[in-house]
A protein has these predicted regions:
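A short acidic, amphipathic alpha-helical/loop segment
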Residues: 24-29, 284-288
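Short, well-ordered beta-strand core segments
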Residues: 35, 92-94, 297
Length: 352
């Protein structure tokens, strides 16, 4: 419609998408759609909102809660604002520090970079940060976790890749995505299900309650037909004692897995190196990164715990936390892959 009215090219910006399913609709509907996240350090963002919009600390906390994706209500999982998830699935990540209130030069430079690539894919090559993070993004697809897929890469100080990792169970064990409640209750397979899962009555009762509930729903709507009824061991175990203990996860974290590959297959040392992660390190992985003398941690999605305040920002050899900026996933290929080799393009332009 805009093209017809203006009789010209149309470049459209939608401000602002805060629901991940809205974003996925546009991603699936329009091939040229790019979901862009603009990130700023939490302390900069708070000061900016207080100064520009005159928000109080309580008002900012309320906004954070609304945008967290955790508010309750009918169909809330599908209709809630969830900025954290939107950042996770973004195609392009921009960094907008607000240490100087009126200085937007860093943001402007990044916008110019990606607009140029949208109009002319392959005009310039990706940055080293983008190149390595794209590998981490690819690695996360190997994860068999049914909650969240995370990828990680460890490099030396020159961004030469030394190891990769993703969140998954130890080698030789069956990932959660390939296990099921049916198998747990009926099969007693010692390869797929642990001795605890096969013999602890409290755990099995809780798991069976979940399976019965699913079967009751399926009798009415057949909604689960064709689905593997995977389950999260941690969720069921924690529900027994009403504790949110992260120790009970079956999977290694992606960062932890990448560190272990260095030991498993040998390494010349990683002191002063870098950790790239599609999430950000938890408290346990942050300690491991610190002990390995990782110099920089490049992350996409800030971890909600106290890893930064309690583990990383202390001592005299603290790793530097860097928010990722760049294109990733499909956008990486769409923006950096030349449609026509530049040499051929120039030759064709001469002939026009």
């Amino acid at each position: 419609m805009i093209r017809k009215v203006t009789k010209n090219k149309a470049y459209i910006v939608i401000d602002a998408i805060r629901n991940p399913y809205e974003a996925k609709f546009f991603k699936d509907r329009y091939a040229a759609f790019h979901l862009v996240s603009i990130n700023a350090p939490a302390e900069h963002r708070s000061k900016y909102m207080q100064k520009l919009h005159k928000f109080s600390s309580d008002q900012i906390d309320t906004i954070e809660k609304i945008e967290s994706g955790k508010t309750e209500g009918e169909f809330s999982a599908f209709t809630n604002q969830n900025v954290k998830k939107c950042i996770e699935i973004s195609d392009i990540h921009l960094f907008n520090p607000k240490s100087e209130f009126n200085n937007n030069n860093i943001l402007k430079a990044q916008i110019a970079w990606y607009i140029a690539l949208m109009q002319h894919p392959g005009l310039i090559p990706p940055s080293s940060m983008e190149r390595v993070m794209q590998v981490a993004y690819t690695m996360k697809m190997n994860s068999g976790c049914i909650s969240r897929q995370v990828g990680a890469v460890v490099t030396d100080s020159h961004n030469s890749i030394k190891s990769v990792g993703w969140n998954d169970v130890a080698k030789g064990q069956v990932p959660c995505s390939m296990r099921s409640l049916n198998g747990l209750i009926e099969e007693f397979n010692p390869v797929s299900y642990s001795n605890y899962e096969r013999n602890n009555q409290a755990f099995r009762i809780k798991a069976n309650e979940k399976l019965i509930k699913i079967k009751e729903v399926n009798l009415k709507s057949q909604i689960f037909e064709g689905h593997n009824l995977s389950y999260c061991f941690k969720d069921i175990h924690n529900s027994l004692d009403d504790k949110g203990n992260q120790v009970h996860t079956r999977a290694l974290h992606a960062e932890e897995n990448a560190f272990l590959q260095l030991t498993k297959y040998g390494s010349s040392g990683i002191e002063g190196g870098k950790l790239y992660t599609t999430a950000s390190p938890c408290e346990l992985c942050a300690k491991k990164a610190y002990q390995l003398s990782i110099a920089e941690i490049i992350f996409i999605d800030p971890y909600p715990g106290i890893a930064q305040e309690h583990i990383i920002n202390i001592g005299n050899n603290a790793p530097k936390l860097i928010q990722f900026r760049g294109a990733i996933g499909k956008a990486y290929h769409r923006l950096y892959e030349q449609i026509i080799p530049i040499k051929d393009e120039l030759e064709h332009m001469i002939d026009l």
